[in-house]
């Protein structure tokens, strides 16, 4: 959800002059997303959006020069294929083993996907603990991980 919302924000600011957070929130709501001003503010910060001149005494949001549309799922697919060595589970916990030094990057991508069943991740150097709620959703999350690993 978060990833799709942020991608939509990047598309909106590229195609429509948006000057305020309130205006951006209205545009997102018009497209069926339920957002608050606080959510929009966090998205703007995470995306690193800047204000650029848009005429005399007018400014609009823009992506920093050289920024592409984000695709954490694609990045996660590459990281999974290159880094994950083993996946195991018990109850509502999934343990992911990775090559040394890559667990934080994989966990960060997992967090950015905003899967509702994943309530959190904890990463060490080569191990990630994924906490799933409810525990019945573990099979679904494991299937997603398998699909990621297959690329």
UniProtKB/Swiss-Prot annotation:
It comes from the Bacteria. Its main location: cytoplasm. Keywords: Amino-acid biosynthesis, Arginine biosynthesis, Cytoplasm, DNA-binding, Repressor, Transcription, Transcription regulation. Belongs to the ArgR family. One of its GO terms (biological process) is protein complex oligomerization. This is Arginine repressor. Pathway: Amino-acid biosynthesis; L-arginine biosynthesis [regulation]. The lineage of its organism: Bacteria, Bacillati, Bacillota, Clostridia, Moorellales. It comes from Moorella thermoacetica (strain ATCC 39073 / JCM 9320). Regulates arginine biosynthesis genes. Disulfide bonds: none annotated. GO terms for cellular component: cytoplasm. It is found in: Cytoplasm.
